[in-house]
């Protein structure tokens, strides 16, 4: 079981490295020597930033599958509103309304 988890972790890292290589290709060989050097430096800095980001993302632990928040959300989703009776169609007249109409 442990070997399988290690293998899956290795495959995930390889996929991540492949993705990073696709995102940040090696610079072209055209231009003066200083232009090529600057492009290589920029690429190296970008590469280190991407690797740092990838390691941060890879080391973030997964949230627990059954946290109290998840249980509370499931309970709230299970709630339903009860059907209310229809309101009355004709309203009874009150004495205060009649007094205002006569004056």
Swiss-Prot record:
| Single biological process term from Gene Ontology | mRNA transport
Quick one: where's region Disordered? 80-103
Cellular component (GO) terms are: host cell cytoplasm; host cell nucleolus
An annotated Gene Ontology molecular function: DNA-binding transcription factor activity
Record note on domains:
The RNA-binding motif binds to the RRE, a stem-and-loop structure present in incompletely spliced viral pre-mRNAs. This region also contains the NLS which mediates nuclear localization. These overlapping functions prevent Rev bound to RRE from undesirable return to the nucleus. When Rev binds the RRE, the NLS becomes masked while the NES remains accessible.
Summary of subunit composition and partner proteins: Homomultimer; when bound to the RRE. Multimeric assembly is essential for activity.
* Protein name (Swiss-Prot/TrEMBL): Protein Rev
Gene symbol of the encoding locus: rev
């Amino acid at each position: 079981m442990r070997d399988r988890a290690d293998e899956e972790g290795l495959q995930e890292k390889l996929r991540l490295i492949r993705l990073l290589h696709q995102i940040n290709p090696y610079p072209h060989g055209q231009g003066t020597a200083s232009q090529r050097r600057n492009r290589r430096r920029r690429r190296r800095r970008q590469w280190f930033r991407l690797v740092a980001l990838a390691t941060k993302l890879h080391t973030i632990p997964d949230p627990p599958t059954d946290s109290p928040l998840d249980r509370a959300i499931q309970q709230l989703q299970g709630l339903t509103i009860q059907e209310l009776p229809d309101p009355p169609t004709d309203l009874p007249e009150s004495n205060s309304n009649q007094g205002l109409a006569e004056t």
